[in-house]
Amino acid sequence: KEGYPVDWGNCKYECMSDEYCKDLCADRKATSGYCYKLNWSCYCKGLPDDSPIKTPGKCRSGR
């Protein structure tokens, strides 16, 4: 699957570089990833089915 990877609070990972997102996506066993610059968020392709991605609803930050 593909989508924006999220943390425990359904918050996307902000980015400024593709390199950061490639590493983040690789850590989640995705085949590729990049920084989607229109909203400055990491986007992964080829994620395992059990990997959490952004769902509708608010980000519950508490970082």
Curated annotation (Swiss-Prot):
Similarity annotation: Belongs to the long (4 C-C) scorpion toxin superfamily. Sodium channel inhibitor family. Alpha subfamily.
Organism of this sequence: Rhopalurus junceus (Caribbean blue scorpion)
Cited Pfam families: Toxin_3
Location of the LCN-type CS-alpha/beta domain: 1-60
Keywords, sorted A to Z: Disulfide bond, Ion channel impairing toxin, Neurotoxin, Secreted, Toxin, Voltage-gated sodium channel impairing toxin
Gene Ontology molecular function: sodium channel inhibitor activity; toxin activity
InterPro entries (UniProt xref): LCN-type_CS_alpha_beta_dom, Scorpion_toxin-like, Scorpion_toxin-like_sf, Scorpion_toxinL, Scorpion_toxinL/defensin
This protein's name: Putative alpha-neurotoxin RjAa9
A GO CC term attached to the entry: extracellular region
Keyword hit for Disulfide bond: yes
Domain comment as written in the entry: Has the structural arrangement of an alpha-helix connected to antiparallel beta-sheets by disulfide bonds (CS-alpha/beta).
Tissue specificity: Expressed by the venom gland.
Function: Alpha toxins bind voltage-independently at site-3 of sodium channels (Nav) and inhibits the inactivation of the activated channels, thereby blocking neuronal transmission.
Subcellular location, record wording: Secreted
Cystine bridges: 11-59, 15-35, 21-42, 25-44
UniProt superkingdom: Eukaryota
Gene Ontology BP annotations: defense response
